[in-house]
Every structure is written in structure tokens, then in C-alpha cells.
């Protein structure tokens, strides 16, 4: 109150100027207190001159000379001043906080302003803060989530904010519905389940067909023996046929050539490979593909 009574003429002049949409900050006379050092009528140099940043004190509060054309011009002047300070984080800087407190105090002292003028000043002040954050590399808009323990005052919500919330609410619900549907589709794929079910249902039929084919080819044991394993023992068989005596033919050899042969089991095939006998006629001294009995049973191919 003492401050306002001392600068009453200046305050009235400022009030009339603010009603016209402009803001003028005149040097105010303030009494020293114990908490903050006295604020002097220091004049900030011209905008083109860089301001040197020094230790924080009350003397660094800007007292701009001249009359800015409008509040927007004044805020642009303040922005240039704060950019010249080269502050890395303006939100935590003591000078910026002190300047904002000083500016808020000056605006509160002008309590005779109309409501519309105060709203315009507040809007320009918010724009100034956004421009200042952008100048330091911070984004203009940030998506923030309010804490759970913070209560929202519904009286401060503007109609525009309520309209934006109503427009975004269906989009959020639509996204949640799409994500839920995609998760359910990925969790249970009907086509994949049908394919697995068909394979399991056809498995007994496949086993039955394999058994029938095995019974059909029992009279042809050469089909049960893979010819791919034969070349592995070719060199050994020919080498032993030259350097070693030929084993005598067993007595039941002619009967084996005339009668039918039983299918070769895996155990018998392994034993024959160990003794290096013919897989078809169970005789030594020749290879399976050179067996005469096999050739005699194989039907002759017709020449085209």
C-alpha cells in the first residue's frame, strides 16, 4: 500500500495506458527488505547489445527504457533480453523466476484494470512464456498426464477445451477398440486352428496308407533297400575280390534263387553290410546292382 500511495500519479498514468491495450513499466521506488536486495532504476541497454550474465541479484531485474508500442512488443523485448542471458534451463533459473515474480507483482498492483484487459494480458503472458520456451529448444506443446492426487477445478475449464476433449474422446475409445480386436485376432486365429485340426484328423489315414504300401511291396525286397548306400562299399568289395579268396556258395543257394525272398529287415541289412554280402541274394563276391538274380527278376524295358 505504501508503494502504491507513493507512485499514485504514475499508477494512474499506467492504468489509463493499459486500458488502451498497452503496458508501460516505469521505474518504481521500492523500499529495501531483509529478504531481497533493493531494486534500483537500472536501465537495460539497447536490444542489439548483448547482456552479460553475472551473479544473481535484484539489480538484474529488467527496467526497460522507452515506451513499447504494445504489450506484445514489450514481451518481445523481454524475450530478447532473456535470450541474451544464454540460460540453459529457464524453468530452474533464479533470474527468470525473479523476473516473473516481479512482473506478476506489477500486474497485481494495477488492480483497477477491467476483466477483459486482464484476460488479454494473461493470454499475452502465456504466449510470451511459450515463445521463451521455444527459444530455448523446448517444444511448444507437451502431452502431460495429471497426477492422480490432483483435483481439477471445473470452473477453470474453457468451452474450447471441453470441445477439444469431446472430439478426442471418441478417437481414444476407437483406438482402444481396435487394439482389443487385434489382440483377440492374434490370440485365436481360426484358420490356423482349422489347419492343425485337419492334419490331426488325416493322420490315421496316412498311417493306414503307409501300411498298405508296405504290404504291397513286400515281394520286392530291392525296393526296401536304398541304392544310395551301395557306392560306399564298392571299392572295398572289388578290392577284396582280387586279393582274397571267394567264399564258397552255400548249399541252399539255388533254392534262394528260385524261391521267393523275405523282405530285408533293418537288422538283417546291417548284418549283411557288416559281412559284405549281396543284399539281394545274400551271396558274396559281387555287388547288389550286379546280381544276376536281381536282373532275371527285373522286367525288361521296352525300347522306344
Swiss-Prot record:
Cysteine disulfide partners in this protein: none
Keywords: Metal-binding, Zinc, Zinc-finger
PROSITE patterns: ZF_CCHC
Keyword RNA-binding attributed: no
Molecular function in Gene Ontology: nucleic acid binding; zinc ion binding
Listed InterPro entries: Znf_CCHC, Znf_CCHC_sf
Keyword flag S-adenosyl-L-methionine: no
Changes seen on gene knockout: Mutants are viable and don't show growth retardation in the pre- and postnatal periods in either female or male mice. Animals are fertile, even in the case of mating between mutants. They exhibit abnormal behaviors related to cognition, including attention, impulsivity, and working memory. Animals show a reduced recovery rate of noradrenaline in the prefrontal cortex region.
Any one GO biological process: norepinephrine metabolic process
Zinc finger (CCHC-type) residue numbers: 276-293
Source taxon at top rank: Eukaryota
Tissues expressing this chain: In adults, expressed in brain, eye, kidney, ovary and testis. Weakly expressed in thymus, heart and muscle.
Function field: Involved in cognitive function in the brain, possibly via the noradrenergic system.
Additional remarks: RTL4 is one of at least 11 genes called Mar or Mart related to long terminal repeat retrotransposons. They do not correspond to functional retrotransposons, but rather to neofunctionalized retrotransposons genes.
Name of protein: Retrotransposon Gag-like protein 4
Organism, scientific name: Mus musculus (Mouse)
Amino acid at each position: 500500500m505504501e508503494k502504491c500511495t507513493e507512485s499514485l500519479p504514475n499508477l494512474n498514468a499506467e492504468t489509463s495506458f493499459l486500458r488502451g491495450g498497452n503496458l508501460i513499466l516505469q521505474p518504481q521506488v521500492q523500499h529495501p527488505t531483509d529478504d531481497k536486495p533493493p531494486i534500483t532504476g537500472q536501465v537495460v541497454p539497447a536490444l542489439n547489445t548483448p547482456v552479460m550474465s553475472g551473479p544473481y541479484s535484484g539489480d538484474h531485474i529488467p527496467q526497460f527504457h522507452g515506451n513499447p508500442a504494445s504489450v506484445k512488443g514489450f514481451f518481445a523485448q523481454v524475450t530478447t533480453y532473456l535470450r541474451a542471458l544464454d540460460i540453459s534451463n529457464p524453468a530452474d533459473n533464479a533470474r527468470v523466476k525473479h523476473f516473473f515474480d516481479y512482473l506478476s507483482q506489477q500486474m497485481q498492483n494495477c488492480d483497477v484494470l477491467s476483466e477483459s484487459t486482464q484476460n488479454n494480458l494473461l493470454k499475452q503472458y502465456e504466449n510470451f512464456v511459450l515463445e521463451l520456451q521455444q527459444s530455448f529448444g523446448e517444444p511448444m506443446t507437451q502431452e502431460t498426464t495429471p497426477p492422480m492426487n490432483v483435483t481439477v477445478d471445473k470452473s477453470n475449464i474453457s468451452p474450447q477445451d471441453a470441445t477439444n476433449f469431446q472430439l478426442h474422446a471418441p478417437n481414444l475409445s476407437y483406438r482402444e477398440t481396435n487394439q482389443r480386436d487385434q489382440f483377440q485376432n492374434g490370440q485365436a486365429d481360426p484358420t490356423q486352428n482349422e489347419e492343425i485340426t485337419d492334419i490331426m484328423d488325416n493322420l490315421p489315414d496316412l498311417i493306414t496308407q503307409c501300411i498298405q504300401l508296405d504290404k504291397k511291396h513286400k515281394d520286392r525286397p530291392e525296393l526296401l533297400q536304398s541304392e544310395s548306400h551301395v557306392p560306399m562299399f564298392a571299392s572295398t568289395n572289388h578290392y577284396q575280390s582280387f586279393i582274397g579268396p571267394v567264399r564258397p556258395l552255400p548249399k541252399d543257394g539255388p533254392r534262394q534263387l528260385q524261391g521267393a525272398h523275405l523282405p530285408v529287415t533293418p537288422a538283417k541289412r546291417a548284418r549283411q553290410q557288416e559281412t559284405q554280402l549281396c543284399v539281394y541274394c545274400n551271396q558274396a563276391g559281387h555287388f547288389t546292382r550286379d546280381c544276376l538274380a536281381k536282373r532275371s527278376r527285373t522286367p525288361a524295358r521296352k525300347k522306344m
